[in-house]
Amino acid sequence: MAYIGRRGLLAGAAGAFAAAAAGPARAAESAGAAGRPGSRRKAAAEFRGMWIASVENVDWPSTAGLDAGEQRDELASLFDAAVAHRLNTVFLQVRPTADAMWPAAREPWSQWLTGRQGVDPGWDPLGTAVADAHARGLELHAWFNPYRVANNHTDPARLASSHPARRNPGWTVPYGGKLYYNPGLPEVRAFVQEAMLDAVSRYAVDGVHWDDYFYPYPVAGQYFDDDDAYARHGAGFATRADWRRSNVDTLVREMSERVRSVRPSARFGISPFAVWRNRDRDPLGSDTRSLATYDDLYADTRTWVREGWIDYVVPQVYWHIGHPTADYAKLVPWWAQTVAGTDVDLYIGEALYRCDPGSATAAWRDPAELSRHLTFARRYAEVRGHAYFSAKQVAADPHGAMARVVADHYPTAVPPR
């Protein structure tokens, strides 16, 4: 079966995962928490989260150009849905395409608010969101995308006149009909951290959250042209792939350190595609046959966990129990083993959006499939919660799958701390 995951939903790239399905891996050596000295506030006894995606107006705002009151009311309604379903955390996407859902010092207002990048929406969405979430007893994790610049074009001249990528087009790489910052440039790495930390320093966010976007997902027939950056900065690496992984590792490690410095109470977490490596390529990999973050996205997610660079990981295990090439029942124990012995909390990302009576897959036509996921995951003490993609499915729950999860697993509310 073709896998159309969150990336396909958000970016409209329906063909990119046609051959992909997944599951990750772990080793038994002791983990290093040295990457994050000190201790953060204790995490929830049971994490219950949902993603609110703003890119392409997936969840919120429902459409660009609503007035400030309508936008705020819609966001409040999603927070209310989280509370009604006994969740305790929301991931709000506040930097979807190198633009901002707050009055940012370094980047323009997001196009997904008004329909035009750089236009003031007349309110402060992130500031309001933090206050409104906390008033409801919810944690608010600010969700950032580090490298994505444009989702539907490759021309820096189409960006807002103040956009740093327009002023520095040499920082960008066009690929697959989209525009990205080049992860191989040290100046890019420094800039994107400053852009994100602008929000972290100014708002009482409970977490800093990244998803599965690092180097772009492979597109057939396309070449990610970082030749010049590799020539200038790739000395000392055996392969370009090793250099690319080092670029992403450095960003994760540095951001981890800086979040701790700027806002010690905030947790830093990442929600990667759920396959680190396949076992046929690495004995530490998962029993899967899929695209893999290590080999295809240059994201060494296992190292981030084992080195303690992140506080939590939310692998997007977006397949059903029994999937032939990426079985939920194989991926969850792999991740449980990966975090074992570390201080990294494991939450499982759940594909609520795939629960659909019209699905071609029988498992997803069954509203009890998601509940079975939680039942299965409870076998593993390392699994400390779940997060659901995405908010509009939590709120509408057209198939009753979320209601079943709540009835079977969330009899009472659990505070976030």
Where are the regions a protein language model picked out?
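Active-site neighborhood of glycoside hydrolase catalytic domains
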Residues: 202, 207, 216-272, 276-279, ...
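Substrate-binding cleft of secreted/luminal carbohydrate-active enzymes
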Residues: 312-322, 342, 346-416
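Glycine-rich, aromatic-flanked loop segments that form ligand/cofactor-binding clefts
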Residues: 45-49, 87-95, 125-172, 209-211, ...
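Aromatic- and acidic-residue-enriched segments that line the glycan-binding/catalytic groove
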Residues: 102-114, 148-175, 213-235, 282-289
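Active-site-adjacent "subsite" loops/lids of carbohydrate-active enzymes
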Residues: 57-67, 147-198, 296
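N-terminal export signals
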Residues: 2-3, 7-27
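Extracellular glycoside hydrolase catalytic/binding regions
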Residues: 244-251, 266-333, 359-375
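Catalytic domains of carbohydrate-active enzymes, especially glycoside hydrolases
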Residues: 73-98
